[in-house]
Each structure stands twice: as structure tokens, then as C-alpha cells.
Design a protein with these regions (language model features):
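Terminal-region recognition feature
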Residues: 1-134
Length: 134
């Protein structure tokens, strides 16, 4: 997402907030956890999706979703996307829906909103008669 300048200050502040949230969502569980994945020779969920999809076709859904859990101190830890990358795009020119669980966020563990994102992608795939990859 490239930064833009708006004439209206309110639009600029909203755009800046969207840009900040987008950048935050792209980092998953943070730079340290991404480095740990790379040190093990593994790709992140986002990197796997980008490799799979035809260039420039992936549209992410639910990028800003966060979990609602409060037990075990989770009310103090929030990551945008809630540990799963979901969306659609093309593979070899064919529409597909994808989800990829992000180990950098809570070890890729399943929360209520995490599961809801996967179910939404499955429903969209069925509705549109397209395959799902997860």
C-alpha cells in the first residue's frame, strides 16, 4: 500500500491510520518471530500464499480481524488477522480461495475468529464453485 496525501486533514488522518494498520497486519506476530521462522528454513504464512498465487492476484479478506479471547492474558495480546491469512486469487489463471495459518501469531492456534475466517473462505469457495487451498 503506497502512502498518499489528501487535501482534507480528516481524510489524511484516516488514510494514515489505514496505512499503519495494513503495515502492522503484514508483520503477523512481529519481526522477531518472522526471523525465527526464516532461521528454521520456513516461510511465513503470507510468504507461502504469495508464492502460490499468480502475481498481483491475491486479495486478502479479514486482514484486520482480532480475537475476542480474554483468558490466559490474551486480552493484552492482539494481532491483526488473528493468525490466519485468508483470501482469494488465481493459480495458473484459475480462481482459488486460500487460507494459511500463521505460526508467528500464537503458534497458528485456532481461535473463534480465526475459525470464522476459514469458514467464510470455505463458504465463498462453495458459492463460487472454486477450489480451496489450506
Amino acid at each position: 500500500m503506497t502512502k498518499r496525501k489528501h487535501k482534507e486533514p480528516i481524510l489524511q488522518s484516516r488514510y494514515d491510520e489505514l496505512h499503519r494498520k495494513n503495515e502492522e497486519a503484514l508483520t503477523g506476530g512481529g519481526a522477531k518471530r518472522i526471523e525465527q521462522q526464516h532461521a528454521k528454513g520456513k516461510l511465513t504464512a503470507r510468504e507461502r500464499v504469495q508464492l502460490l498465487m499468480d502475481e498481483g492476484t491475491f486479495e486478502e479478506l479479514g486482514k484486520f480481524v482480532m480475537h475476542r479471547a480474554t483468558d490466559f492474558g490474551l486480552d493484552k495480546e492482539h494481532y491483526l488477522g488473528d493468525g490466519v491469512i485468508t483470501g482469494y486469487g488465481k493459480v495458473n489463471g484459475r480462481l482459488v480461495y486460500v487460507f494459511s495459518q500463521d505460526f508467528t501469531v500464537f503458534g497458528g492456534s485456532l481461535s473463534e475468529t480465526h475459525a470464522e475466517k476459514i469458514v467464510k473462505i470455505m463458504e465463498l469457495a462453495m458459492k463460487n464453485g472454486a477450489p480451496i487451498i489450506g
